[in-house]
Design a protein with these regions (language model features):
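Secretory-pathway ectodomains
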Residues: 2-474
Length: 474
């Protein structure tokens, strides 16, 4: 019985060894599958999907690159901001000798520097990346013994002048001369230069004592006192001197107090025994303060605000119409990228207040002894004494702050993602610190020259000044 069961289970089986009959030149595993056409590889089924993935990656890369370029262009176009930095900056080039304070301008694609030698005042255009001289033009003689001082200036709003450089060259009068020479009217020559090649495009004079002279667009606004103490203000073409508009104050401005004039686009503020605010575009009177009222004014995005000891602060529309009361004047920021267009920041000294631009409604209030400096990317950079930091502009929360253990020699800047502020090395030497705008994490520290006086953003470029040198970093 057992033998039959065993015999039933044990059957003869023949095994065909295909490897014996297969050609020696081909491995059995190399045979194409029976159910696929010859020449059709399985991976080919997936090539359309792979192509789509590659296209998506390329598109994403191109989109990110476009966003980066757009971000760089947007930040670079904001006066007072530094062009976004890819790494810690290093000195690119420098100009030694006597350069007028503030006399570096962004003109077209060049950096223009006003400097004084022993013989002359000279305007020189440099390539921002290399410092190579593009052109140089003498504009006036240096100060000489026996003559009045001849300090040349080239005014600008926010350091950018576009295609036209305007320089103001005093014509010094002889000192210790005869009475006729002493009584000669002061004369100031306006020298317009093409930013492209330095070509002098004209010349015209301003005669008489000047209370103030400032640039707006390609024009100059000039304030002068009349013999009876009234203030005469003219807006004149920077190229030709042609008068755009003219205004004379109805009351004397300088009988008991010194008169002054400031251009704060879109307004011109005349100060003295009374305060008068003009429209910078056409010279219309927008506000006329009472005599000795102590009226102050500050511009804000096409509008302006006023403050007086009696009556407090008010926001005004562009035509001078009073809109609403305010707790104080709006903070004057060194840079504003427009990321909070409907917000007004007011500095009350011990507190910062955010108001709705349209209605004046208070949005938030936070205790802070620091002053607002820069508004960028919905963040408010603040500083004061030896401290600087960042607030969230949407709610006033402090995001971070740092104490440098020393008085700030210059105010912090930003490149849109970093705060570039002053600091000290462990051995007490000046440094430029870069901290993340969002959280204050320190990325790098760059040594600065001893006796650094200013660190500024000019046309997006980082400019460091000492008493004797002007150094461009990048």
């Amino acid at each position: 019985m057992a033998d039959r069961r065993l015999a039933a289970r044990m059957q003869r089986v023949e095994i065909e060894d295909t490897s014996v009959t297969a050609p020696l030149s081909r491995h059995p595993d190399d045979e194409p599958p029976a159910d696929l056409p010859t020449g059709h590889h399985p991976l080919l089924r997936w090539w359309p999907l792979a192509a789509v993935v590659v296209l998506c990656l390329v598109a994403a890369t191109m989109l990110a690159s476009a966003r980066d370029r757009a971000f760089v262009a947007r930040i670079e176009a904001v006066p007072g901001l530094v062009r976004p930095l890819d790494a810690a900056p290093t000195p690119l080039w420098e100009v030694g000798g006597r350069t007028a304070n503030g006399a570096v301008l962004a003109a077209d694609s060049a950096l223009v520097v006003l400097g004084e030698s022993d013989d002359e005042w000279r305007v020189t255009a440099h390539d921002p990346a290399t410092g190579a001289v593009l052109w140089a033009v003498p504009v006036g003689p240096a100060s000489r013994s026996g003559f009045e001082s001849s300090g040349v200036t080239c005014p600008a709003q926010s350091g950018a002048v576009g295609s036209l450089v305007l320089c103001l060259v005093p014509q010094p009068r002889v000192l210790y001369s005869d009475e006729a020479s002493i009584q000669e009217q002061p004369r100031l020559t306006v020298v317009p230069l093409s930013a492209r090649d330095g070509t002098r495009t004209g010349s015209w004079d301003v005669r008489g004592d000047v209370v103030g002279i400032e640039r707006i667009d390609d024009d100059l606004v000039i304030g002068q006192l009349t013999p009876d103490g009234h203030l005469k203000v003219q807006r004149r073409s920077g190229r030709s001197g042609a008068v755009v508009w003219s205004y004379v104050t109805p009351v004397a401005m300088a009988q008991l107090l010194t008169a002054s004039m400031r251009v704060l686009p879109p307004i011109v503020v005349l100060d003295g025994e009374s305060t008068i605010i003009l429209d910078a575009a056409d010279g219309r009177t927008l506000v006329a303060g009472a005599r000795f009222s102590g009226l102050q004014a500050a511009p804000l995005r096409g509008r302006f605000a006023t403050w007086a000891p009696v009556g407090g602060a008010h926001m005004h529309d562009v035509d001078g119409t009073e809109l609403y009361r305010m707790p104080g004047l709006p903070a004057q920021l060194a840079a504003d990228d427009g990321s909070e267009p409907a917000r007004v920041i007011v500095d009350e000294g011990s507190q910062l207040v955010s108001l709705d631009l349209g209605t004046g409604t208070e949005q938030w209030r936070t205790a802070s002894p620091l002053d607002p400096r820069v508004l960028v990317g919905h963040r408010l950079v603040v500083s004061g004494a030896g401290t600087y930091g960042v607030l969230d502009a949407s709610d006033g929360r402090e995001l971070w702050s740092v104490d440098t253990d020393d008085a700030l020699g210059w105010e912090p800047l930003s490149d849109g993602t970093l705060v570039l502020g002053p600091g000290l090395s462990p051995d007490g030497r000046p440094e430029l610190w870069a901290r993340a705008l969002a959280d204050g994490v320190r990325y790098w520290a760059v040594p600065l020259p001893e006796h650094v006086r200013h660190v500024d953003a000019v046309g997006g470029h980082l400019v460091v000044r000492t008493p004797n040198d002007l150094i461009v970093y990048g």
